[in-house]
Amino acid sequence: MSRMDTNGKRLFIARHGETIFNLAGRIQGEHVHTPLTRTGFAQADEMGQALARHLATEEPALDLIASDTDRALQTLSVIAEHVGADWHQARSDARLREIDMGEWGGAWYRDLAGKLEIDHQEGLFATVAPGGETYRDIAVRLERWLGEQDFARDTVLISHGMTSRVLRGLLTRREPHPRFDTPIAEGLPQGSIVQICDGIETVIHLGGGEGEKA
């Protein structure tokens, strides 16, 4: 099996719900403890309902995987309840964390005006934070993670805005972004969930939140 395959199984990928950092306008990066807001829990609830409807005629045995951050694990717990999966059997991995924003992690976006360039059309950071990761760095850790997966069952995976876009880009075999030399999928509103099976992506639910911010 190629490391970019899902072995004929479905991989349901979502970003965590809105957090207190999202709401306040702070950069999370790889910060571990940034809990969901009420809106974030509602988004997780909607994603869980949508996935349950998508699987309504099936009773698949689902694997659960998430970043090891609170916001990802909280989101996964709500979705798991809707689809009858055991959250206690979930696996977490730090390689699924958000882009490391280095010295800017935890900063307020307003305080980085003139320093952090954002491509608002594509929803991507155009500046590498001091001590932070590039999109290529994210791809390298995700490729290593993918190389260890056998995808023996359908899987629900909760990650983060930028990281999930790179993961989706890798799994759908997109051409590298000309500016960042990395496969990066299109951004989706917070609260969205997609299905990827052997390179084909299908949007299961389109959320109503904002686009990706780390």
Per-region residue spans from a language model:
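Acidic, low-complexity terminal tails and accessory targeting/binding regions
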Residues: M1-R10, R53-H54, A85, R97-R110, ...
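Active-site signature of alpha/beta-hydrolase-fold catalytic machinery across serine-
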Residues: V78, V166-L170
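Short active-site segment of divalent metal-dependent hydrolases/proteases
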Residues: T19, T163-S164
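Generic beta-sheet signal
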Residues: L11, L62, A152-G161
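Phosphate-handling substructures
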Residues: F21, E81-R141
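Conserved histidine-centered catalytic loops in small-molecule metabolism enzymes
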Residues: A56-R95, E117-I118, Q195-A214
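Generic enzyme active-site microenvironment
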Residues: A14, D93, I158
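Active-site-proximal alpha-helix that buttresses catalytic centers in soluble enzyme cores
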Residues: K9, R15-A85, E133
